[in-house]
């Protein structure tokens, strides 16, 4: 009689306890996605510069109105806690000291991708849609464009737009957010 192997997914609570217990190396860059732990790709200079630029611009635009979160965890559900490059969060005076933001707190997620474009587009962006995050951007460094995904329904984004160098990327859900694609790409 053959026996099927069964996967056992890790919950966010278990993952966080593992981190607190020192199971992971301090230099490990990890994400929990759908119950599985993934090693994050190294961050190159163009990627890092883009994240810094976005963070600075968004802080300038929304200072005191929204929280700009950079490479911090978001608890999507009991089995996923990604660390998007940038996220715009609803303002909270405690700055989420007692719990990570959840989808209801997130107005926009931005993933910056160089070597991870396909996996971010086909795996992480749909994960954000399934969680109900209203808008996600993929800054596609190789193709020099920003891909906007908005209005999640039935686990997928209904609106998809592409902004090229020379365009202004205009948020679909945040009225005051418009940013030069050329400036973002550097």
Model-found features: residue ranges?
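Gly/Pro/Ser/Thr-rich low-complexity, intrinsically disordered segments predominantly at protein N-termini
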Residues: 1-186
């Amino acid at each position: 009689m053959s026996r099927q192997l069964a996967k056992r997914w890790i919950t966010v609570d278990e993952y966080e306890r593992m981190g607190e217990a020192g199971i992971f190396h301090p230099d490990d860059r990890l994400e929990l996605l759908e119950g599985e732990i993934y090693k994050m790709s190294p961050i190159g200079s163009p990627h890092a510069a883009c994240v810094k630029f976005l963070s600075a611009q968004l802080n300038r635009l929304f200072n005191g109105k929204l929280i700009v979160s950079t490479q911090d965890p978001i608890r999507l559900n009991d089995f996923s806690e990604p660390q998007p490059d940038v996220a715009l969060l609803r303002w909270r005076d405690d700055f989420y000291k007692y719990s990570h933001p959840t989808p209801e707190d997130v107005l926009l997620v931005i993933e910056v991708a160089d070597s991870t474009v396909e996996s971010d587009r086909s795996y992480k962006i749909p994960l954000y849609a399934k969680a109900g995050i209203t808008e996600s951007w993929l800054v596609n460094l190789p193709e020099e464009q920003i891909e906007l995904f908005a209005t999640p329904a039935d686990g997928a984004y209904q609106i998809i737009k592409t902004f090229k160098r020379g365009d202004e990327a205009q948020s679909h859900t945040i009225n005051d957010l418009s940013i030069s694609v050329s400036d973002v790409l550097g």
